[in-house]
Design a protein with these regions (language model features):
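C-terminal, non-catalytic "cap/extension" segments appended to globular domains
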Residues: 66-79, 94, 263-370
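Post-HExxH zinc-binding segment in Zn-dependent metallohydrolases
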Residues: 199-242, 300, 304, 338-341
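Contiguous, non-catalytic segments that form substrate-binding/exosite surfaces or channel walls
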Residues: 44-165, 352-366
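Catalytic Zn2+-binding segment of zinc metalloproteases
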Residues: 185-197, 215
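N-terminal helix-rich structural modules
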Residues: 1-81
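Long, amphipathic alpha-helical stalk/connector segments used for oligomerization, subunit docking
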Residues: 221-293
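Short pre-active-site segment immediately N-terminal to the catalytic Zn-binding motif
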Residues: 161-181
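Active-site His/Glu-centered metal-binding helix of metallohydrolases
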Residues: 180, 184-188, 208, 299
Length: 370
């Protein structure tokens, strides 16, 4: 069955939802799903409706094949030690996609949530420093932050006009700092994906949150709290985990004998327990996660980032420093795509290079105590 959708009607519906958000500064799951739906059909003239799998975007498998090709090419050009490390990581993570406490993350996120709770405790103490680290965001007109007494938090970003809103309010489970950091991650992911959208992609946001951290860590390190480095380490590991899990999925796809809808569906179910009913939604969001990394060189940047985080987690300081030096160049190129030159930025160099020496001491201490 083929449904003919009116683009004018779709745009009208989407505009009405966006006006509702702007007026009420709030949206729920229904609005999120509606906006997601309208965006998914906006650029398709013919939408094929199937009972099991409605609204599959055209070109999805083609995009997966392209990513698979670039992944293999980038992998073949990696240094041997990084290639071995990466293969070990993706194989180890093959069955742990839905388990945040599985190896190698059980030391990072213990089952009693001590690290996470400590992170929030530190975050509460530095809430007053929000304006400091957001100054850079303001000056580059990436996002406008508005503190509202509301029951939820979300990010709206108008990519083409380079403006948007982040709404957040602290509650018993979180803090202004942690919410805003998360929502700003959404704003960066939305900008890099080039969409004029009003909904969030969690996988993308968690992945890019690592780059937001270079603006926030300075103020964490300035505090005298005994556990002042833990929130930084937690965020590094969360971003690393999301990145390497994405690579693990891509690695499985790249090793399929024949990349087609059925083979990818079967692989996702067997390895990651993705139900057939969620196949379209999961796969489209996975594609979006890698939208920026559509060249062999850029996939190489992601390898470098994962290598540096793996070395840091293992306490391999020599390898960590080597990988980090490559990652600095990667992050600066990432920000250049946003029109921000941070390669010569004092703030960037101070936080990402000098302050990581303090972070290394904490990691060494943690590994010694094991």
């Amino acid at each position: 069955m083929i449904l003919k959708w009116s683009k004018d009607e779709t745009l009208k519906n989407l505009e009405s939802l966006q006006k509702y958000i702007d007026k009420n500064r709030y949206y729920d799951e229904n609005i999120l799903n509606s906006i997601d739906f309208y965006n998914s059909i906006l650029n398709d003239d013919d939408i094929f409706l199937e009972e099991e799998e409605p609204f599959i975007k055209k070109g999805l498998i083609k995009k997966l094949k392209n990513l698979s090709f670039l992944y293999k090419k980038a992998l073949n050009n990696m240094p041997s030690y990084e290639k071995k490390m990466l293969i070990n990581m993706v194989e180890e993570l093959g069955s742990s996609f839905i388990n945040p406490y599985a190896k190698p993350f059980k030391e990072v996120m213990p089952s009693d949530n001590t690290l996470y709770e400590t992170s929030l405790e530190v975050a509460e103490k530095i809430d007053k420093d929000l304006v400091k680290y957001l100054d850079y965001i303001y000056k580059n007109k990436l996002v406008n932050v508005d503190r509202q007494n509301i029951e939820t938090s979300y990010c709206n970003i108008d990519v083409y006009n380079k403006k948007g809103y982040v709404y957040a309010s602290p509650n018993n489970q979180s803090s202004m700092f942690s919410i805003l950091n998360h929502e700003l991650g959404h704003s960066v992911s939305n900008i890099t994906n080039g969409y004029n959208i009003y909904y969030n992609l969690p996988s993308v946001a968690e992945f890019y949150s690592i780059y937001m951290q270079i603006f926030t860590d300075k103020y964490l390190y300035d505090k005298t709290h005994d556990n002042k480095y833990l929130i930084s380490y937690y965020n590094y590991m969360m971003a690393y985990r999301q990145s390497i899990l994405g690579l693990a999925v891509l690695n499985h796809i790249a090793n399929l004998d024949n990349i087609n809808k059925d083979s990818v569906r079967e692989m996702l179910y067997e390895n990651y327990k993705v139900e057939p009913s969620n196949f379209r939604n999961y796969l489209e969001r996975f594609i979006l996660m890698f939208d920026y990394y559509t060249t062999e060189e850029n996939i190489g940047y992601l390898f470098s980032f994962c290598s540096s985080m793996k070395a840091l987690n293992d306490g391999d300081n020599k390898l960590y420093k080597k990988a980090l030096s490559e990652d600095i160049d990667s992050v600066s190129k990432f920000y250049n795509t946003l029109g921000i030159d941070i390669k010569n930025s004092e703030l960037f160099l101070e936080i990402f290079c000098k302050e990581n020496e303090k972070l290394e001491k904490l990691i060494r201490k943690r590994n010694t105590a094991k």
